[in-house]
Amino acid sequence: MEKDLQLRVNEKLDVENILKDLDKYTPKRRGWTWRQPAENLQMGPFIYKDASTPLENSVALPSAKYFGDIDPQPLPVITTEIASGRFEDDIRRMRMAAWHGADHIMVIRTAGQSHYDGLIEGTPQGIGGVPITRKQVRAQRKALDLIEEEVGRPINYHSYVSGVAGPDIAVMFAEEGVNGAHQDPQYNVLYRNINMIRSFIDACESKTIMAWADMAQIDGAHNANATAREAWKVMPELMVQHALNSIFSLKVGMKKSNICLSTVPPTAPPAPSMYLDLPYAVALREMFEGYRMRAQMNTKYMEASTREATVTHVLNLLISKLTRADIQSTITPDEGRNVPWHIYNIEACDTAKQALIGMDGLMDMVQLKREGVLGDTVRELKERAVLFMEEIIEAGGYFNAVEQGFFVDSGYYPERNGDGIARQINGGIGAGTVFERDEDYMAPVTAHFGYNNVKQYDEALVSEPSKLIDGCTLEVPEKIVYIDELDENDNVNVRMEETKEFRHSSMIKPEVEWQADGTVLLTMFLPTSKRVAEFAAIEFAKKMNLEEVEVINREVMQEAEGTRIELKGRVPFSIDINSLVIPPEPEILSEDEIREDIEKTPLKIVAATVGEDEHSVGLREVIDIKHGGIEKYGVEVHYLGTSVPVEKLVDAAIELKADAILASTIISHDDIHYKNMKRIHELAVEKGIRDKIMIGCGGTQVTPEVAVKQGVDAGFGRGSKGIHVATFLVKKRREMREGK
């Protein structure tokens, strides 16, 4: 990799640089990569049973700060879907996702690309996805080559090999180093109405190419779940669809270990989802032993609440843990209300990492109870699926079954309601475009399915036909015809010209999806009904000078008492970060300097949690030697306990001739924490000791600047440690001695 393209942790990824010399780029590797198990991994104080090799660079979970900032990685590959319509902005999001543990980046195609009869070129903007083109794929794979070096783990790049141009896309993906793809002819037939004969013939070619490139294949059975009227009734059919594509792929020549079943828990609360979904997950994994499981998250039963979606997805993760998942796919919790935003891709990755690591070693302690309802339901599901397959055979095969509307029927098989999706064998897009090859047909290319009369030219090259032309594009990338742009207006260069100010200056704007899109999210509670709250919220946002305001979530707290509203809008301005007045980070003294100062002049403090407050953990961590508190530096601490009246704390300071008062206050109702701080200061003034004593106050809801306004010397907020308090005590005492 060129030196000037190496990423630096504290520098933004240069998308403009990525786009340079794409005509000369070739992928550094092919094939899918699985995570490497790290048996009995020791990280911090813990040993992990189901973890993989850690990353070299990553962003740990927020609570990792309590455990030495460790960032253990679960064993399943973690998927995130990134496709905003502008691939150039997605590259930046891919870097963020990789730092949060994603190693499978899936790019959804723009709406309608399934029906394009050939490849498209250039970089047009997409709708509901990204136009998949050679330039776009090459740029993103090139960026991922850099990103995977930065984080220290291979990243799998993935899109879709389906639609009318499936084989064309498969060849391009193999040429460009794409590592995985969806490929399932049933998707074409049922959901895109592409002729079934054409779809299966094309699938033979596509799967052969994917097998050559060692791509992982994900099937399309999960679409039946998303399409069905009542998803929990489609489980037998899901198993049939998995079976058809899996055995078909195996027969074409794919490795079993690269064939992944796209399985999704069919339901979500308030349905009894574990009771319904777990037996299905168990049955599927038992029937398809040896195949890979790509565990998807439920999208059918999602509304606009990100909290609700996250809980559903954690339940999905529990099923993955109780059964098996080789790839754990994630769904952004905002998918029910908008095209996914940057932050929600990251939230989804963190949800998967947090849940799976939290359940590390779980199966060493629990096992599924096979006697009773679980075992009975598993057997029943298998029986229903087998009967479904037998009926397909009786009907004359898959094509006839599709014509008769067997699939995505709302009945729970063997019940049928007659409302399934029906397609005609000789109908659909691409009908009549399949022809038998002539006897002298020959294609001098690698990974070509079916009859190929190479023998007529060179019998020795039957298994290596591309040698007839000194290699095809799969072996000789220089033969690839690279097309840059076709549309002079709808392309990445025009879009990036519009936003270059935000890459080449100190100007900044909020964004959620595209660079400098200006979108912000507001959450508010309004004490009124849902309908009134929605329009009141819009008016509030307009008075805040937001533009293009749209309510994206409404949740009733109580019909009369109030509604939670979430809305988005655009800020019509940017700011210059060079004009910001940013106070310097507080200086922290070295431990040696603190100890030396206190050894020369001993320091005594009194400490307590004040008011009617029983919280003590935070204050004890700041004080106790075992937590790295101020005792370790030689500070003499007199701890008075919790719920201590402020008068008692000040009196104790006088009685003990203390140098400082430390007060902890967690409860913040009606600003009682700040009122207590002000009262401590006032009492110290009244009793004539304020100029002789230091006062520091802290708590999770404390803002240091606001605390100082109450008259105390320092405030300590969330995340403050003993060394921060010790630094304050030493520095403040020096100032007092010097009369500052």
Swiss-Prot record:
It catalyses: D-ornithine = (2R,4S)-2,4-diaminopentanoate. It is an enzyme of class 5 (isomerase). Optimum pH is 9.0 or between 8.5-8.7 (with Tris-HCl buffer). Half-maximal activity is observed at pH 7.4 and 9.7. SUPFAM superfamilies: Cobalamin (vitamin B12)-binding domain, Cobalamin (vitamin B12)-dependent enzymes. Gene3D superfamilies: Cobalamin-binding domain, D-Lysine 5,6-aminomutase alpha subunit, D-lysine 5,6-aminomutase beta subunit KamE, N-terminal domain. Its EC number is 5.4.3.5. Substrate binds at residues 81, 160, 182, 294-296. Increased activity in the presence of dithiothreitol (DTT) in vitro. Inhibited by 1 mM potassium phosphate and potassium chloride. Inhibited by L-alpha-ornithine, D,L-alpha-lysine, L-beta-lysine (50%-60%), L-alpha-lysine (26%) and by delta-amino-n-valeric acid to a lesser extent. Significant decrease in activity is observed in the presence of 0.2 mM p-chloromercuribenzoate, N-ethylmaleimide and also by 2 mM iodoacetate to a lesser extent but not inhibited by arsenite. Keywords: Cobalamin, Cobalt, Isomerase, Metal-binding, Pyridoxal phosphate. It holds the Pfam family OAM_dimer. The modification N6-(pyridoxal phosphate)lysine is found at residue 626. The keyword Metal-binding applies. Adenosylcob(III)alamin binds at residues 614-616, 664-669, 700, 720. Residues 602-739 form the B12-binding domain. GO terms for molecular function: cobalamin binding; D-ornithine 4,5-aminomutase activity; metal ion binding; protein dimerization activity. Optimum temperature is 37 degrees Celsius for native enzyme. Displays half-maximal activity at 23 degrees Celsius and 49 degrees Celsius. Rapidly inactivated at temperatures above 45 degrees Celsius. Loses more than 35% and 30% of its activity when stored at -20 degrees Celsius for 1 month and at 4 degrees Celsius for 48 hours, respectively. InterPro entries: Cbl-dep_enz_cat, Cobalamin-bd, Cobalamin-bd_sf, KamE_N, KamE_N_sf, Lys-AminoMut_A, Lys-AminoMut_asu_sf, OraE-like. Its cofactor is adenosylcob(III)alamin; pyridoxal 5'-phosphate. Heterotetramer of 2 alpha (OraS) and 2 beta (OraE) subunits. OraE may be the catalytic subunit. Active only on D-ornithine and 2,4-diaminopentanoic acid but not active on L-ornithine, L-beta-lysine, L-alpha-lysine or D-alpha-lysine. This is D-ornithine 4,5-aminomutase subunit beta.
